[in-house]
Amino acid sequence: MAKYLIMLFPIFALMSFISRNATEPNPWTTKDMVSPEKLSSLIQDNDKSNDPIILNIGPSGAIKGSLKIGSVDNPKGLGLLTNRLSKIQKSKMVIVYCGCCPYDNCPNIRPAFTILNKQGFTNKKLLDLPVNLKVDWIDKGFPME
């Protein structure tokens, strides 16, 4: 009996995680989204005064100028993100992206955006990658490292 409970626990934990994510509202709004086209133009703009801080919070490739944090679906990753954010002015434009998968399945964007909200960032953005980084950024020829 104990053997079966041990085998079933991960399944129940996963189901709980999925149902919780499905019922919780996203911590971002449509006004918090930035299109790939807009970010690409900001990256290629010669005016460095309006450059955003771009944080890669997933396992995907590096967009030009982004800082690699890595996955934040674990305490170590959340700690790295929190530490990096502590060095950034709250009014600075901060754009996060993961690009591993569609938003509904992504384990990284919700925790990252929640931290941005809790820390009081006023110009926080989520890069709009509804499918993944390859389809929504790389295949369209936007700048990579």
Predicted regions and their residues:
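Flexible, polar/low-complexity N-terminal or interdomain linker segments that lie immediately upstream
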Residues: 6-63
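Rhodanese-like catalytic fold shared by cysteine-dependent sulfurtransferases
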Residues: 2-4, 16-31, 61-145
